[in-house]
Amino acid sequence: MPRVKGGTVTRQRRKKIMKLAKGYRGAKHMQFKAASTQLFVSYKYAFRDRRRRKSDFRKLWIARINAAARQNDISYSKLMHGLKLAGVDMNRKMLADIAYNDSKTFAQLADTAKKALN
């Protein structure tokens, strides 16, 4: 039986890997083995960080709300509890956007939370 070398299939597979590895430094964009190893790691990081992005944004929103709340003489936890008692149903993303862009409206929300706590 004659030896089968793979031919076009192997070349296409390697070409695809090398195309995906464009922009990597050193051997990782030139050598197939290094490129395929790095791609595996890159996809692993991408998978992990797609999930991590959600918690990163939540942390950012909480930090922004807390900073704006403390300017209005109330802590983050008391603000959130007060808004819940007052029946204000806003998620952290919306609150952070209001705190960042519209401080007067946020001050009104903080006053609403303070009144609900008393």
Curated annotation (Swiss-Prot):
InterPro entries: Ribosomal_bL20 (IPR005813), RIBOSOMAL_L20_CS (IPR049946), Ribosomal_protein_bL20_C (IPR035566). Keywords: Ribonucleoprotein, Ribosomal protein, RNA-binding, rRNA-binding. One of its GO terms (molecular function) is structural constituent of ribosome. Coiled coil: none annotated. One of its GO terms (biological process) is ribosomal large subunit assembly. The keyword Membrane does not apply. It holds the Pfam family Ribosomal_L20. GO terms for cellular component: ribonucleoprotein complex; ribosome. It comes from the Bacteria. Belongs to the bacterial ribosomal protein bL20 family. Binds directly to 23S ribosomal RNA and is necessary for the in vitro assembly process of the 50S ribosomal subunit. It is not involved in the protein synthesizing functions of that subunit. This is Large ribosomal subunit protein bL20. The gene is rplT.
